[in-house]
Design a protein with these regions (language model features):
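Hydrophobic alpha-helical segments embedded in or immediately adjacent to the lipid bilayer
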Residues: 300-320
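Glycine-rich, flexible loop/turn motifs
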Residues: 122, 132, 141, 148, ...
Length: 503
């Protein structure tokens, strides 16, 4: 028997017109579910109509349920006609008829209330969700000095509302579905209908529909199921906790996947360039943003290549150094028993462990652990003549460069590539250094994301100068950014009208 595709209970049956049958069925299916609340009532002038209400404790707004559903039904004036029930529950914010037990049980487990009516072969679903969740808080992972401070929560509807609040356009679509055969996690696709490329949208929808797994609990999991090329360390999707970033991305023709229970929203498609765009890039003047972006691209090269470059120079090609630098290197390494490669790996791995320890420790203690631990370990290693002072400086500069890159998933790929270059340089010196960088660049240039080159706009598939260069290393003034990037469908790339005064 295929235990994955076989349901524990057969939920495909239709709803019985006899309330007692529905009670027996629900009790059997939901056996040992002590958080299930079941209530039976007799209503009508002569109390001849049986009702059965089912919901999960802790997932519903009981006050709303009592005031809008139960109290009207218990009125003595309730008519004998069963079809008149909708007139007495119209105060409920949202309700509808459902026909199968599968829909009924799924609704109950999703935080809704289901009412079974004797003599009616269908049930009424009341929207009564009231999940325990935290409120909207500051974005702690993508801090911005200028601009909005709010961030997403674990509530799907709260997150879609934060986006809808910023884009008050009827063409902003929200397509809601479920994923996971057991978790039945709600998710929503959000896009602007006249900006999105329909072929990309269709591909994403087909990918999501094909995912057959028992549970999806975070967009980080969903990202891994969506990616086609799992042989690259570079992220092919973007995760963010900032509603303003999602709103601006949607207005560029991109698609957002909002997953219930996840405080991060998935953006796709992506290119290499979007990972260097900080949250407040568009709230600052273009000169400042351009300067910062150039620094970030330099930081990316340093974070990947500096340790390997030091291994290549100190271990294979010290003759390329000017004499004062060479003497300083020899003096710094005096008394160190290990070769250069062991020095660098020892310090890099130590800093990686300190970084992980800082992440795992709670609150401010984690940041303190990272800074103080790094200083203590580095100084102790130098005093013990296990490593040279130059190696500590190299590793520290590499760490600073890595932390300056805005996207955490992207920096994780850089951390792996750093060790790749260190190993190559340990065997072949500068030849390994340049070959390694060449291999990384070739890999990036060959990657694609839904038909869009990953290295766009450095790689342009249409053989013409891309409008994306206006938002690349140099960020043009906002008045000159008249076109949307290549994510947008053809014919909808104009973002703003020409200023007659500037002609």
């Amino acid at each position: 028997m295929d235990h994955f595709h076989t349901r524990t209970h057969n939920l495909k049956g239709t709803i019985s017109p006899h309330v007692q049958q529905n009670i027996k069925y629900t009790t059997k299916v939901m056996q040992d579910c002590n958080d299930l609340v079941q209530k039976q009532f007799k209503i009508g002038t002569n109390h001849e109509i049986s009702l059965y209400i089912v919901y999960m404790d802790g997932l519903v707004d009981t006050e709303m349920l009592q005031e809008s559903v139960i109290r009207p039904l218990l009125q003595d004036s309730f008519p004998q006609e069963r079809t008149a029930i909708n007139q007495y529950v119209i105060e409920s914010a949202d309700w509808k008829w459902i026909d199968t037990m599968e829909d009924a049980m799924t609704a109950v487990l999703s935080g809704n209330t289901v009412l079974f009516l004797d003599g009616e072969a269908r049930a009424i679903l009341f929207s009564s969700k009231s999940f325990p969740t935290r409120g909207v808080q500051n974005a702690d992972q993508e801090v911005a000095i200028v601009g909005p401070k709010d961030s997403f929560t674990e509530s799907l509807r709260t997150n879609t509302a934060l986006i809808r609040r910023r884009i008050r356009d009827t063409r902003l679509k929200v397509i809601q579905k479920q994923i996971g055969t057991r978790s039945k996690t709600d998710y929503a696709l959000m896009y602007i209908d006249d900006l999105v490329q329909k072929d990309i949208l269709n591909k994403i929808q087909k990918q999501l529909d094909k995912i057959c797994v028992d549970g999806i609990f975070d967009n980080g999991m969903l990202e891994q199921y969506l990616e086609k090329d799992s042989k690259t360390p570079f992220p092919l999707y973007q995760l963010t906790q900032r509603p303003d970033k999602v709103a601006s991305s949607i207005m560029e023709g991109r698609i957002a996947v909002v997953l219930d229970n996840s405080p991060m929203v998935l953006l796709l498609p992506v290119t290499l360039n979007v990972f260097f765009q900080a949250s407040d890039d568009y709230y600052n003047r273009w000169e400042i943003t351009t300067f910062v972006r150039i620094l970030l691209y330099m930081a990316a090269i340093i974070s990947i290549g500096l340790p390997g470059f030091y291994v290549a120079i100190a271990g294979f090609h010290p003759e390329v150094l000017p004499t004062p630098f060479l003497l300083a290197l020899i003096s710094a390494r005096e008394g160190v028993p290990f070769p250069v490669i062991v020095e660098v790996l020892l310090m890099e791995l130590s800093f990686e462990l300190l970084r992980e320890a800082g992440i795992r420790l709670p609150g401010q203690l984690g940041g303190t652990m990272g800074v103080v631990g790094g200083l203590i370990v580095g100084q102790a290693a130098v005093d013990a003549h296990l490593v040279s002072t130059i190696v500590v400086i190299v590793v520290a500069l590499t760490a600073i460069a890595t932390f300056s890159i805005p996207n955490e998933l992207f920096t994780s790929a850089f951390r792996l590539m750093k060790f790749f270059l260190i190993i190559l340089c340990a065997f072949w010196g500068l030849y390994g250094f340049f070959l390694g960088f060449l291999a990384i660049f070739i890999h990036l240039f060959y990657l694609e994301n839904y038909g869009i080159p990953y290295a766009h706009p450095m790689v342009e598939e249409r053989g013409r100068l891309s409008t994306a260069f206006q938002d690349f290393m140099v960020r043009y003034p906002l008045k000159r950014m008249k076109y949307r990037p290549e994510f947008t469908k053809e014919g909808a790339r104009v973002r703003q009208k020409e200023d007659e005064d500037e002609k």
